Amino acid sequence: NLDITLYIADNMTQSIFSSTTLSLKGVGKNPTKAYMSALKMINYKRPELKSFVEKGKNQIIEYYNSKCDFILKDAESLAGRKQFDEAIYTVTSIPDICKECYLKGKDVAINIFKQKLENECMQNIADARTAKAKDNYDLAASYLSNILPDVSCYNDAQILLKEIEDH
């Protein structure tokens, strides 16, 4: 005999959306084989499993719909602390079935990504200036080559690159 508990949960937030316990029986030459036999006997069409999954889906939707503003604020707070990747992950984890929150999350993700690019641009310019001051012009130029034309400091990067090339 084996009792197995199944969970639908979010490990990051420690939220449990649904759970169910199944009592199973299996036969085998040793306990491991008996457990494997029991697990193979799970009928995935059992009403309690369908109910378990449906409840989990509904709870996930309710969770994201009710906590959307908090999730978005948390992401913006992470971005404010320059934890851009974690912030983007937070908003891109919103399931698309939660349409309104998902769409808001996409907009926030785009803004955070732009902030990340701006931050990286400023960092690359600072690193390039440091390398230039040490007469390491190749390294300075390589920092500047990572800067995309879409960011606001691109022109500053081009001016610095021209100074390096003219040296």
Regions found by a protein language model. Name each.
Residues N1-F17:
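Surface-exposed short loop/turn segments
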Residues I16-S142, P149, N155-Q158, K162-H167:
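C-terminal/domain-edge helix-coil "capping" segments
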